[in-house]
Amino acid sequence: LGMDPTAIGRVNATMDSVLMGHLYAKAAIDVACWDATGKSYGVRICDLLGGAVRERVPSYHGVLIASPEGSAADAARHQEEGFPRIQLKVGGRSVEEDIAAIRAVAAVLRPGVRLAADANRAWTTSAAIQVSQACRDIPMVLEQPCASYRENASLVGKVAHPIYLDESAVDLATVVAAIGEGVADGFGMKVSRVGGISAMRAVRDVCAAARRPHTVDDTWGGDLAAAASLH
């Protein structure tokens, strides 16, 4: 690009002017610009973003698809390691199996340890409603229960739990729409998917203004993506 990496806003505007989309590719450049800017001023990226609000960041553990007993054992083990949130993978099997796994995991969690049932788009709307209503006594959130934004929107008022969007939360515009339309109670955000730290900062501020919680992590990118998410 031949540009000053500390002019992060102009770098992003230039990329957007010559190439639509491709946010994963742009994210790498955006994160590199933030890194270069922080180093040039001798400060951390989090300080550029307004200052660190904590020195230790709570995380969550993902429990993969397994038997109810296996899922419960995994959740209990990582609860003892100090994880304050357990994300249980569901979907891709019968509704009855998902319900059994959710109940088994919920039974071993201590008060204060939060539970998310993450279908990663695997449920139909019917399955999401069945599982939620069958587990309405269990405090948890439903993360990306169905594949499309429209399907998840149709669940509002029919499920007994808050809905978090993950794969459908592809950019700031979708986050704004989901909040305004009452579709999402929270979000699972990926730094690389939305285009980098600059876009994630905007999502953070919108969620803060609307009092919507969100996670910040990434599926790919290794230590670099993890470091960007941490800041």
Functional labels for PLM-detected ranges:
Residues 1-40:
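Metal- or metallocofactor-binding catalytic centers and their adjacent structured scaffolds
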Residues 16, 40-65:
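N-terminal small/glycine-rich loop or linker at the start of catalytic domains
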Residues 23, 55-70, 90-91, 120-124, ...:
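Active-site mouth loops of central-metabolism enzymes
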Residues 43-44, 54-59, 81-84, 111-112, ...:
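Short coil/turn connectors at secondary-structure junctions
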Residues 53, 57-59, 65-77, 94-109:
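Active-site loop-helix segments enriched in His/Asp/Glu that coordinate
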Residues 77-89:
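Catalytic domains of carbohydrate-active enzymes, especially glycoside hydrolases
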Residues 88, 93-227:
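Catalytic core of soluble alpha/beta enzymes
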Residues 229-231:
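Oxidoreductase and adenylate-handling cofactor-binding alpha/beta cores
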